[in-house]
Amino acid sequence: MIEVKCEYQIKEDIGFILEAERINDAELAERTKISRTTLDGIVKRGRTTGSVYEKFYSYAYENKYRINSVKEELIKEKYRDVLFHGSRNGLTGVTVSGSRANCDFGEGFYLGETYGQALAFVCENRKSSVYSFRFASSGLKIQRFDCSLEWMLAICYYRGTLGKYGQSSIVRKIVSQVEKSDVVIAPIADNKMFYIMSQFAEGEINADAALHSLSASKLGLQYVIKSEKALERLIPIEKYYLCLPEREDCRRSLIERGYEIDTKLKLAKREFRNGLYIEEILK
């Protein structure tokens, strides 16, 4: 287990807004509806209440300041390898056994390669946050997947939809490779994508149609920390506040992406009618 002692950097972010807007504390207090006393308290203590975080970061976001996204760029310029994790209720510590067993690759600590990926997984939750971590993968045993049949079978296995096919030699070999690894690096599969995978697992669509539909997702890669050795390579950097306007923008973009995937699936069913079905692959 590693401890996570990150707080929102609101003191520094307030300083940035004051400078960028060329305003003083009194003007910021008027614009954000945060009292001068509260702003002074933030300068002294570096933290505040949930409602104040929301007022400040909503003000910044609605005035076109994309603080979190720009911080991602700056951190990636400073450090070579940076990963992001979205948490629904905040983190105090991280373990490799904290996730559900029916996640994409079983138990592990799941991270994405971008801030946007982490945001997308928690944008429905009012108290959610995103965390950034440094990560050094050298010397670790890494299992990599691309958008492939093996990737799809692995996720279907761990999410529990393969049924009798879960004991096939092909699937068992893939699972063995995952369980022996320190880190799994693979395309992200959200619930919209898993719906397509489950259609394949149930024999409703063939592998070619499924994979061509999934290739439209463009969610990027996830990193799954599977061992204590890999977990020790994570170094927490910062915690990011997710205000309501930013979460709503994210939700809207996910809805649009869902339309694209639905359209791609319908087109793929027409284009790839002769692909192999699961019973033919795992017979």
Question: What residue spans do the PLM features occupy?
Answer:
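Key DNA-contacting residues within the recognition helix of helix-turn-helix
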Residues: R36, D40-G41, G50, E54
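ADP-ribose/NAD+-binding catalytic cleft of ART/PARP-like enzymes
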Residues: G50-D104, I255, L265, N274-K283
